[in-house]
C-alpha cells in the first residue's frame, strides 16, 4: 500500500469519526473558554493545542496535559473536548488538549517527539502560563496513554519533566504483537472481534511505519526496569471488555515491580474508549481520575 493510499484510507476513517457524538446543545453548554494554540517547542516541533480555561483561574493553578486516543491515526474529537472541560471544571485547572500529529502522514516517532516536546514546554514556561510546575499532570487515553508512557520513558534520560502524577488508561503497550493474537480461541471465532483486531493491526502498521516496533518509545512494555522506575505516581485503568486489558494490566505490574506507586483498577463492564465515549463505567472512571488528581495537587 502506498503512502497516498494509506492517507486516503485514514481520511475516510477520520471523516466518519471526528464529530457528531456530542450534541450542539451540550457543546454550547460546556464550561470555560476554549482557545486554539500552536506551540513551538525546544525540540523543533510545532504542536496543535486546544486550551480549556476556567472563568477564574486561581494563582499557581494546576495544568493537565491531555493526550487523546484514536489509534494514532485519528485526531481530537468533540468527546475529548467534553472530557477536558469536565476535568477543567471539577479541578478548576488549566487544560491543554494536545492534538498531536497523526499517522500515516507522520509515523513513529513523530507523535512521541511532540508529546515529550509539549510536556517539556509546559514545565519550562509554567510561570508565564500561570501554573505551578509541581502541579502538572499528564493524562493519556488509548494511543494517548502510549504517548504518555513514551514521554516518561524518554524522561528517564533527560530528567526534564516532573509531573506530579500521570494517568494512562486502556492503552497499547506492545506494538510488536498482532492484535488478533491477543484474542482468546472463542473470540477468534467472533466476526466482531476479528474485524476489530484487523482494524487495530492496520492502525498499528500505519503508526509504526518502517521503524522497529520493539523500541521502548513505541512499545513501552519493552522498557527496562531502570527507566520504568523513574515514572511518577500512576493511575492505570483497564476495561474488562477490551482486548488491550491484559496488556494494560501487565504494564501496571511492570511499574509496580520497578517500585512505582501505581493505582490500578479494572472496570469490568467497560469497553475500549469508555471514559471519553461515556459508555458503561465512565462515571466510575471519571470519579477515579478526579480523586487521584486531587490527591496529588
Label each PLM-derived region with a short phrase.
Residues 1-11:
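Generic N-terminal low-complexity/basic-hydrophobic segments
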Residues 7, 21-29, 33-297:
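Alpha/beta-hydrolase superfamily serine-hydrolase fold, recognizing
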Amino acid at each position: 500500500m502506498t503512502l497516498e493510499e494509506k492517507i486516503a484510507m485514514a481520511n475516510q476513517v477520520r471523516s466518519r469519526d471526528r464529530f457528531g457524538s456530542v450534541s450542539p446543545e451540550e457543546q454550547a453548554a460546556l464550561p470555560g473558554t476554549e482557545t486554539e494554540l500552536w506551540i513551538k517547542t525546544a525540540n523543533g516541533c510545532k504542536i496543535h493545542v486546544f486550551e480549556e480555561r476556567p472563568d477564574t483561574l486561581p494563582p499557581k493553578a494546576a495544568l493537565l496535559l491531555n493526550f487523546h486516543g484514536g489509534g494514532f491515526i485519528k485526531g481530537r474529537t468533540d468527546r475529548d473536548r467534553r472530557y477536558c472541560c469536565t476535568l477543567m471544571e471539577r479541578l478548576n485547572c488549566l487544560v491543554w488538549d494536545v492534538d498531536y500529529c497523526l499517522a500515516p502522514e507522520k509515523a513513529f516517532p513523530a507523535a512521541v517527539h511532540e508529546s515529550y516536546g509539549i510536556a517539556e514546554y509546559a514545565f519550562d514556561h509554567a510561570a508565564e502560563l500561570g501554573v505551578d510546575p509541581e502541579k502538572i499532570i499528564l493524562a493519556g487515553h488509548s494511543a494517548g496513554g502510549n504517548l504518555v508512557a513514551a514521554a516518561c520513558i524518554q524522561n528517564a534520560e533527560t530528567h526534564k519533566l516532573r509531573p506530579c502524577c500521570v494517568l494512562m488508561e486502556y492503552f497499547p503497550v506492545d506494538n510488536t504483537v498482532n492484535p488478533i493474537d491477543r484474542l482468546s480461541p472463542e473470540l477468534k471465532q467472533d466476526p466482531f472481534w476479528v474485524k476489530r483486531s484487523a482494524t487495530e493491526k492496520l492502525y498499528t502498521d500505519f503508526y509504526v511505519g518502517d521503524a522497529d516496533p520493539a523500541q521502548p518509545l513505541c512499545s513501552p512494555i519493552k522498557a527496562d526496569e531502570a527507566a520504568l522506575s523513574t515514572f511518577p505516581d500512576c493511575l492505570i485503568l483497564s476495561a474488562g471488555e477490551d482486548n488491550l486489558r491484559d496488556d494494560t494490566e501487565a504494564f501496571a505490574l511492570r511499574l509496580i515491580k520497578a517500585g512505582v506507586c501505581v493505582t490500578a483498577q479494572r472496570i469490568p463492564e467497560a469497553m475500549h474508549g469508555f471514559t471519553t465515549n461515556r459508555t458503561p463505567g465512565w462515571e466510575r472512571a471519571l470519579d477515579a481520575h478526579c480523586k487521584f488528581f486531587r490527591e496529588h495537587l
